[in-house]
Amino acid sequence: MQTRSLLVLLVTVAACGDDGSSAGDGGPGDIMIVVDIDNGSCGDTVRITGEYINWEQASGFCGINEAVFEVEGGGQMDSTAPNGRFDLCTPDQAATRLVITQPTANSQCTQVPAGYTLPTILYARKDVIQSGAFYSARSWTTAQQDVIFTAVGQPFDAAKAQLHVHVDGTPRAVSIAAAHGPTQAIASGTEVWSAGATGTDVFFPNVDVGSGQTMLTVAGSSVGAGNVPLIAGTLTNVTVLAP
């Protein structure tokens, strides 16, 4: 976990439901933390840095190289480094979708040669970025997909959305309002996915798309709870801070 130099703002946000609220609205227990972050050369825009890594890390850390992160609709973009790190400027707004173009080469993270073909996005919230949270996004290869969904206990459904939540800080229980398949999570101190909804990373498979968003709730106080986007056949990556 990164060390954060906090300023003086720590405000609890009133709980709200998901009826009619827009994506990026705070959810129950959502708080605001402002950190003196390095905005680099982003000027009046917002700098986001983080990592894009292979779904499985149990055999050792492995980033996804040469993926392209781009602000949805055209704009700033950045290619990931060999360790999966990215760094780019995003619009100064409450939330931004970053569309990820997968690398053309096969993964260097798996024994079975395969590429990343799953449409994937990162949903970046300004309040999470400015809290100092570390964004960690994941994706899986075509070969890994069958293994992942065998563990889930149901096949991958392209008509439904996939949602990965990275919990930066204290591992917490995470839930969503939309119907979904059995959750998987990585417990603190491990890099092994297993059944559950509490950990440093939580996966909601085969989520009903519904209106195109769902309310994300984190046990206890957090930054980043609230509505998150859902897209059929697409993996959405979200990060929340749990101080």
Q: What are the roles of these predicted feature ranges?
A:
Residues 1, 13-42:
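Ser/Thr-rich, Pro/Gly/Ala-heavy low-complexity intrinsically disordered linkers and tails
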Residues 29-47, 132-161:
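Beta-strand-rich domain onsets/edges
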Residues 34-68, 164-176:
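Structural motif
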Residues 63, 68-91, 180-203:
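Short, acidic Ser/Thr/Gly-rich low-complexity loop/linker segments typical of extracellular
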Residues 1-7:
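Bacterial N-terminal signal peptides that target proteins for export
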Residues 104-136, 208-210, 217-243:
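Structured interaction patches on ligand/partner-binding surfaces of diverse proteins
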Residues 85-105, 193-215, 219-221, 228-232:
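Short Pro-Gly-centered beta-turn/loop motif in secreted/extracellular proteins
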Residues 76-154:
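Short, low-hydrophobicity acidic/polar segments
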